[in-house]
Regions:
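Intrinsically disordered, low-complexity acidic/proline-rich regions
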Residues: 1-124
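Extended amphipathic alpha-helical segments with heptad-repeat/coiled-coil character used for oligomerization
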Residues: 5, 13, 258-281
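Long, charged all-alpha helical bundle/coiled-coil segments in cytosolic proteins
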Residues: 104-207
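Non-transmembrane, amphipathic alpha-helical segments
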Residues: 117, 144, 218, 222-229, ...
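Feature marking long nucleic-acid-engaging regions of large polymerase/nuclease enzymes
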Residues: 163, 178, 191, 213, ...
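Short, charged/polar, low-complexity loop and linker segments
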Residues: 206-224, 239-247
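Hydrophobic faces of stable alpha-helices that mediate helix-helix packing
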Residues: 227, 231-241
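Internal amphipathic alpha-helices that form coiled-coils
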Residues: 241-269
């Protein structure tokens, strides 16, 4: 629960820890807006929409989250996954409640001494938990029912809520952060340009999703990884926009923004080659 909320807009646009202040009390822990902003800054690259690192398998004892999530995909590399068998919810119910106690201690250590390593662990717990929670939600739909599941069992619900609050994210499934930005592995090599549609398609197909609901190499992979490929242009857009605001070589920087926007659109147009357009009607 938030308390001591204040917003100050004097002389600058407010953000967490600098104009937007509050205290968060949750599961016996206390942290503030400044700590949330610092945690976020340890996870996400500056002047970009990309994280410092992609999602990683969790270490013990949190590896149970990774293990279940990697088995949930409906079309799971030649076999039917947990969602396809309508058994994901039951698997998640088997997670021991003591995992939440361990995570609370982990977060307390981060509050006392926030590091990139501790922030990354929290971010990874959040991402895997979010995938599992949303997998539970949509599991009935995949199995012919008309209503989604509205129940997230403990301790998954607690892990998701605490990890979301301290990273400044919503507990609800985040399209950008969860579905795309942190759950795909970009190749080391970047495209020199995006003028060749076939090369764009090959590049998108080379991006490997780490977790999925429906498939790892079909329509879902194509849709998600197209958007991840597009995000590689974000740094050029943001940095040159900031330079324009500082009246620094405006013409040159506007041309770079135009190029980044063009490349983003060229990659987006490849999506219809890697996923079925009728799915989006």
């Amino acid at each position: 629960m938030k308390s001591n909320i204040s917003i100050n807009t004097n002389s600058h646009f407010p953000y967490l820890g600098n104009g937007i202040e509050f205290t968060e009390n949750l599961f016996g822990l206390e942290f503030n807006a400044e700590l949330i902003q610092k945690t976020s800054g340890l996870i996400w690259q500056p002047n970009s929409t990309l994280p410092y690192s992609t999602l990683k398998r969790l270490p013990a004892p949190y590896n149970i989250l990774t293990d279940i999530a990697l088995e949930m995909t409906v079309h799971n590399k030649g076999k039917k996954g947990l969602i396809g068998h309508n058994s994901l919810l039951n698997e998640v119910k088997s997670i021991d409640g003591s995992l939440m106690d361990k995570f609370i201690l982990e977060v307390q250590n981060h509050i006392d001494n926030p590091t990139r390593e501790s922030a990354e662990l929290i971010a990874n717990v959040r991402c895997w938990s979010s995938w599992l929670a949303n997998g539970i939600k949509i599991e009935p739909i995949f199995n012919g029912q008309k209503k989604a599941c509205a129940f997230i069992p403990w301790p998954l619900s607690g892990l998701l809520l605490l990890s979301s609050r301290i990273t400044g994210q919503q507990p609800e499934f985040e399209y950008a952060a969860d579905y795309v930005l942190r759950s795909g592995v970009l190749p080391d090599e970047e495209l020199d340009n995006c003028d060749d549609l076939n090369k764009n398609v090959d590049y998108i197909r080379s991006i490997k999703p780490l977790v999925a609901f429906h498939d790892f190499d079909g329509n879902e992979q194509g849709f998600r990884m197209t958007h991840l490929a597009m995000e590689r242009t974000s740094n050029m857009m943001i940095e040159n926009a900031l330079l324009c605001l500082n009246n620094d070589d405006i013409k040159e920087n506007l041309e770079k923004i135009e190029l980044a926007t063009k490349q983003s659109n060229q990659l987006f147009n490849a999506m219809w080659k890697v996923s079925e357009p009728l799915l989006y009607n």
